[in-house]
């Protein structure tokens, strides 16, 4: 098999994880401590969430209209800036939390909290310092963290 054929097959492979589609902008990206990857991309009217192992088909892929997401921003979260992107999939709610240091924007912490009724909360921890969060790309409903828990 020649190089062109391999490249074509890779392009045609079913939805390999991690690459915003043409016309989308990266909002959030992080490798997890379990060797997987989380990515959130902003399309013109929707936000797309993808989770799975790099180079393999996504284990989970959600696409919801911008209005289904809430972006919370807070200055002065400890010694940094905090951002949460909150959304639901059925009865399950997801919160992507990101905090960056005021003095060093490469010093970041992030995780994803998953809440399901009747189950213990699950957490996906991102690798420290390897997280990207680009708030200016978000078209979700915006609010301050001080406003309390969002009501869906």
Locations of the language-model features?
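Absolute protein N-terminus
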Residues: 1, 18-19
């Amino acid at each position: 098999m020649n190089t062109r054929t391999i490249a074509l097959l890779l392009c045609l492979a079913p939805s390999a994880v991690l690459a915003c589609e043409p016309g989308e902008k990266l909002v959030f990206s992080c490798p997890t401590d379990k060797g997987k990857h989380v990515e959130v991309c902003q399309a013109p009217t929707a936000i797309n969430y993808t989770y799975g192992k790099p180079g393999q088909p996504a284990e989970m892929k959600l696409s919801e209209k911008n209005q289904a997401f809430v972006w919370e921003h807070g200055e002065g979260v400890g010694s940094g800036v905090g951002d949460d992107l909150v959304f639901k999939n059925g009865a399950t709610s997801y919160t992507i939390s990101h905090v960056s240091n005021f003095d060093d924007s490469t010093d970041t912490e992030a995780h994803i909290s998953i809440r399901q009724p009747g189950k213990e909360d699950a957490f996906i921890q991102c690798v420290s310092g390897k997280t990207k969060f680009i708030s200016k790309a978000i078209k979700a409903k915006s609010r301050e963290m001080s406003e309390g828990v969002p009501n869906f």
